[in-house]
């Protein structure tokens, strides 16, 4: 019996009937129940053997962090927020356990043991002392801790006890004039903890659900104070009547709301609040958050347009890797809480499109080891493992659902029995998924039907095998039963195979300035503008134009500078698109997102147009004059993640 079950048996029912969290639409599975397969396994292995898996070996903001020494004794940090090690830990915990990598587990255990051993007598966790204490950096570290407790029961009791002790102190701090939350030392910026407080509340709700105790009423009080005291409430920001469709980054009164990473995290804030406040208001504001953000500040690749700060929908605005991973996690969380199929579609797109574009061979971000600022270096490892963990969900009392489609294997308990499912697929590069299912008891399987899918050209075939009986195959119509997009398939005890074919074709999405983005399924395609690169020693974020950092222990650490080699100023005629795909059983290159590695491509006719550069560097807003300045030509479109220089929002012309 686990520690959590012992606790639950002794104190169950102590909380007030009114103090009850709103239920998940789909409950998340414990970390480690879901493993990557196929191309997704290759990508995660590249992360483990590349930069994320070696930061603990050389990166001073990780292995010399102030978190690993006695509080107040100092260490290496890129800011006094002390967030580097917590960011890294939040991503490395699930990576280590999903891959069952003993080397990475050793790193995680070493850090967890040191940090928890330094917990102070009054409950504080972290390197700060006195008035330097503030809540923010604990948020990602605690998300790492709860994942470790789920993945490894040897850590469960120690972690739960440490968190419960911390939140007793946290409650006192909030009652003491919002100490460390809205009231910090003059040189500590409180706003990061305020605007991102929903992620801290997730840890509190995890404790309430899994480890009820005599302190539950205090935890509820803490959640309510966090919401009441913060000066930055995402539900009020996402009021359609006042939402800023175009923003001025110099307006300091709204800076926390327009920071790209904050927005990525803030998407789920109203969903987190709904879980303990209930009511239609927070559900609607959750929907507003997604609709307004992606309508006015969203990228076709699934992330948020913000060169750190939002501005408008100009095509030249980029997006941090941090923003992409936080956005995908928020959308996956929102799908589990509220069940809107659109959230799951968007979570898939953010990972399979935007996440890849910022990586080269899993070794470094596109522009370097720590381009301009180190936060993405330490924060990006959470992207893939959280996508894998959240790809399967528990449905009701006897169901298991495939929420985020892709090549994964799951081993878990459903309806009191053991269930093992292997999903073999090249999705999203192909449109078919094959499931091999073994179950010790009957259960209900749920498969998500994406909103963009053509139901008329989709199919399901189920083959059931039972001891001593011949296999029987039945076909089913594909249909989503409700807004969740889930289709229910009863599965009998024994062995079952299932073939799921998604109706897919080229999809044209209209964007600002009479431009379009081209998809096949949820996979965005970009104009192939060629690719050339040069490398150098990695540069310090504080000296990006200097000679680079020598003496690092890994020769693989390089900054890579990329450029295009073909014309980019192209307008296309979408009516001429032709798709060239691969077979369901075709082998996939590893790594899959190298330039031109995927065999999938499209062709489209177009021509060059006059199109100016902004600041002489990047394409400006698309011109209204689409007069061809060249002859008609057939161009090649390739998966966005494999195009290291991107032209995916393209003007149209009728040829």
Spans of features found by a protein language model:
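Solvent-exposed beta-strand/loop surfaces of large extracellular or lumenal domains
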Residues: 455-490, 508-511
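C-terminal beta-rich recognition modules with glycine/proline-rich loops and embedded aromatic residues
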Residues: 286, 345-348, 353-433, 501-655
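Aromatic (Trp/Tyr) and acidic
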Residues: 3-102, 131-154, 194-213, 250-294, ...
């Amino acid at each position: 019996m686990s520690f959590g079950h012992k606790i639950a048996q002794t104190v169950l029912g102590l909380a007030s009937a009114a103090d009850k969290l709103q239920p998940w639409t789909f409950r998340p599975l414990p970390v480690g129940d879901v493993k990557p397969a196929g191309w997704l396994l290759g990508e995660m292995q590249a992360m483990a053997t590349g930069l994320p898996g070696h930061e603990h070996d050389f990166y001073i903001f990780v292995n010399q962090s102030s978190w690993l020494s006695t509080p107040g004794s100092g260490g290496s940090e890129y800011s006094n927020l002390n967030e580097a090690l917590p960011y890294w830990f939040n991503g490395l915990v699930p990576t280590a356990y999903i891959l069952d990598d003993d080397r990475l587990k050793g790193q995680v255990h070493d850090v967890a043991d040191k940090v928890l051993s330094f917990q102070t007598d009054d409950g504080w966790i972290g390197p700060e002392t006195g008035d330097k204490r503030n809540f923010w950096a604990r948020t990602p570290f605690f998300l790492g801790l709860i994942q470790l407790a789920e993945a490894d029961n040897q850590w469960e009791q120690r972690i739960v006890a440490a968190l419960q002790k911390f939140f007793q102190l946290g409650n006192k701090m909030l009652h003491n004039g919002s100490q460390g939350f809205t009231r910090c030392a003059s040189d500590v910026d409180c706003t990061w903890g305020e605007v991102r407080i929903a992620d801290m509340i997730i840890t509190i709700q995890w404790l309430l659900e899994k480890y009820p105790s005599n302190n539950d009423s205090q935890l509820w009080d803490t959640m309510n104070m966090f919401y009441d005291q913060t000066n930055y409430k995402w539900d009020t920001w996402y009021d359609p009547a006042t939402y800023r469709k175009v923003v001025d980054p110099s307006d300091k009164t709204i800076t926390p709301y327009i920071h790209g990473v904050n927005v990525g995290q803030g998407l789920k804030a109203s969903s987190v609040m709904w879980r303990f406040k209930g009511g239609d208001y927070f559900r609607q504001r959750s929907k507003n958050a997604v609709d307004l953000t992606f309508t006015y500040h969203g990228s076709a690749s699934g992330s948020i347009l913000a060169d750190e700060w939002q501005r408008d929908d100009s095509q030249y605005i980029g997006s941090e890797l941090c923003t992409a991973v936080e956005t995908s996690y928020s959308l996956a969380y929102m799908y589990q809480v509220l069940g809107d199929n659109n959230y799951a579609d968007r979570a898939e797109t953010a990972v399979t499109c935007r996440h890849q574009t910022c990586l080269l061979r899993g070794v470094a971000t596109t522009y370097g080891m720590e381009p301009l600022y180190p936060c993405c270096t330490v924060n990006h490892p959470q992207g893939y493992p959280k996508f894998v963990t959240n790809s399967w969900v528990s449905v009701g009392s006897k169901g298991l659902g495939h929420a985020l489609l892709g090549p994964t294997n799951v081993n878990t308990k459903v309806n009191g029995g053991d269930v093992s499912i292997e999903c073999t697929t090249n999705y999203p590069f192909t449109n078919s998924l094959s499931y091999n299912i073994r179950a010790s008891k009957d259960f209900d399987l749920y498969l998500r039907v994406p909103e963009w899918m053509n139901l008329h050209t989709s199919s399901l075939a189920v083959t059931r095998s039972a001891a001593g009986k011949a296999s029987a195959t039945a076909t089913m119509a594909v249909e989503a039963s409700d807004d969740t997009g889930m289709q229910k398939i009863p599965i009998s005890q024994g062995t079952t195979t299932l073939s799921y074919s998604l109706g897919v074709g080229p999809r044209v999405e209209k964007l600002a300035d009479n431009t379009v983005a081209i998809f096949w399924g949820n996979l965005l395609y970009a104009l192939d503008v060629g690719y050339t690169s040069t490398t150098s020693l990695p540069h310090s974020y504080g000296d990006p134009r200097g000679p680079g950092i020598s003496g690092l222990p890994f020769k693989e650490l390089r900054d890579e500078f990329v450029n295009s080699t073909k014309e980019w100023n192209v307008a296309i005629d979408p009516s001429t698109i032709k798709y060239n795909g691969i077979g369901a059983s075709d082998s996939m290159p590893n790594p899959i997102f190298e330039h031109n590695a995927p065999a999938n491509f499209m062709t489209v006719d177009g021509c060059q147009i006059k199109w100016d550069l902004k600041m002489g560097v990047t394409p400006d807003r698309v011109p209204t004059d689409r007069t061809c300045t060249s002859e008609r030509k057939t161009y090649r479109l390739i998966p966005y993640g494999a195009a290291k220089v991107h032209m995916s929002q393209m003007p149209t012309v009728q040829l």
